[in-house]
């Protein structure tokens, strides 16, 4: 077929009413051997880059470091590590460590992945339980 034939074919297809278009699709699926249910079951939705749960596959770049708990016998080393990783003084670092429950290391502060991993390792080596979110 030449391009002129393709152009006229496109015009003819576009002029079909909904019933005729559905019939055309069904016959094309049969002729080409597509599975029952059509192409929509085999082809991902437009926008494609999606992961489970519908979240975008875009890689996250900003992370929070969440301090969860610490080993009681490592309290002093954990306080020192918290002071190293933040600008907190001794009293504030001690209060932070002793406060119950999971909390961000620095409220609202986001870190690059490498920096967050480094902080996590430093705190875990000191005896803290830390996660990155």
Curated annotation (Swiss-Prot):
Entry's transmembrane regions: none
Keyword tags: Ribonucleoprotein, Ribosomal protein
Top-level taxon of the source organism: Bacteria
A Pfam family it matches: Ribosomal_L12
Keyword Acetylation among record annotations: no
An example molecular function term from Gene Ontology annotations: mRNA binding
Gene Ontology BP terms: translation
Record's GO cellular component terms: ribonucleoprotein complex; ribosome
InterPro entries named among the record's database cross-references: Ribosomal_bL12, Ribosomal_bL12_C, Ribosomal_bL12_C/ClpS-like, Ribosomal_bL12_oligo_N_sf
UniProt xrefs under HAMAP family: Ribosomal_bL12 (MF_00368)
Entry's family note: Belongs to the bacterial ribosomal protein bL12 family.
Quaternary context: Homodimer. Part of the ribosomal stalk of the 50S ribosomal subunit. Forms a multimeric L10(L12)X complex, where L10 forms an elongated spine to which 2 to 4 L12 dimers bind in a sequential fashion. Binds GTP-bound translation factors.
Function comment: Forms part of the ribosomal stalk which helps the ribosome interact with GTP-bound translation factors. Is thus essential for accurate translation.
Name by which UniProt lists this protein: Large ribosomal subunit protein bL12
Organism: Ehrlichia chaffeensis (strain ATCC CRL-10679 / Arkansas)
The encoding gene: rplL
């Amino acid at each position: 077929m030449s391009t002129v034939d393709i152009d006229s074919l496109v015009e003819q297809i576009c002029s079909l009413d909904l019933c005729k278009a559905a019939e055309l699709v069904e016959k094309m699926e049969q002729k080409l051997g597509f599975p029952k249910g059509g192409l929509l079951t085999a082809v991902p939705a437009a926008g494609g880059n999606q992961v489970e749960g519908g979240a975008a596959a875009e890689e996250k770049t900003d992370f929070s470091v969440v301090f969860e708990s610490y080993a009681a016998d490592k309290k002093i080393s954990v306080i020192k590590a918290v002071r190293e990783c933040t600008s907190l003084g001794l009293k504030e670092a001690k209060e932070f460590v002793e406060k119950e429950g999971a909390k961000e290391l620095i409220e609202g502060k986001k870190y690059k992945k490498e920096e967050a991993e480094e902080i996590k390792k430093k705190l875990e080596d000191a005896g803290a339980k830390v996660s990155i979110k």
